[in-house]
Amino acid sequence: LCALLLLAAAQIREVPSTTALWAAPAILLAAMLIAWAAESAQFFVAQGFALAILAWLQTLPEFAVEFVLAWKQQVPLLLANLTGALRLLTGLGWPMIYAVAALASRARRRKPLKEIRLEEAHCVEVVGLLVPLIYITFVWAKASLNLIDAGVLILIYVAYLIVLRRMPPEQPEGIEDLELIPRSIVKAPRRTRNLVIVALFAAGGALIYLCAEPFLGSLLAISAALGVPSFVFVQWVAPFVSEFPEKVSAFYWARTIDRAPMALMNMVSSNINQWTLLAAMLPIVYSISRGAPSTIPFDQQQELEILMTLGQSLVGMLFLVNMKLAWWEASSLFSLWFIQFVFSPVKPGPGLLGFLAAHIHWYVTVAYLTWFALGLLRYVLGRRRMDAFHLFGEMWRRHIRPRPAPAVK
């Protein structure tokens, strides 16, 4: 927590664009170290719990950017960054995981990958994503974010971690499927193994802490040289850079095909992390900066941004309820994200492009919400399986709140 606060409190200094030449490889190395640690740790704690810790470490730079914007009371920019980061995760991250796994399947197995099938334990992440989305709907409806909301969102995340902590670790049979480094760690003596896992998490986190600011600063310099508007930078470039470590580790797993579900859950865990902890941090820092308990109000444009992001996450969650992500679902998420992304730098004005730029967010939002409503109707009518909820109920009875064995008479 102290490291996060120190990183977040630091101002993003101007650095030359060439800084990216050393900062980018350092971030890549950090992502690999943390990925190896999480891949090894899943055999001793629940995979979902390891991924939750991994997701938090990987998104430290995103927390830092949001901290600075909230401290400066830049409400339009901090909400733009939050919604941009979340839409990048679901609209670009999830489809890219499928794309990497599909390309690897074509290259290695000579056959197409029609879908990514989740493991049974992943039902916790799928159901865990729904809970904050329900509460965020209430936040959107009242058009503000306050300290009470922060408390509720933090409690939701704590409850999510408690559930994950009670899930069983991966079965030992999967150890031989690991690549050389994580497999060697898992097979090492207990004391050595634990020390190496902690050291990898710590080293990766430290590298992200030390390199995030210069990496972001170098991208800021490059964007300025290319004439990228500040709003576009804050909504798209900064989140992409701050989530870069996460994408590296997720794509590293996705290329193995068999670990594509783990890669996808890495992204879903980050969705939960940002809808809860990141959103909760904003009114806390904002209130401290103002010197009194304060509410972050939403204007009409910000309400639309939040609703569009909420709609996208709801559609993504709905896709995963049957415990798989099909090729057409990944393509749909990417297509809707790409449409509104392309029009982000276009200014509203006369002509067709100007008209579309002024209304595209509304059109995409309606598309998300309509898709969610129709998808929900299919589940209600029994035309699509709600496997995640059935499995979660089973996991709850088996691991979270197991029934005591009947007394022997």
Listing of model-derived features with the role each one plays in the protein:
Residues 1-409:
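Hydrophobic alpha-helical segments, chiefly the membrane-spanning helices
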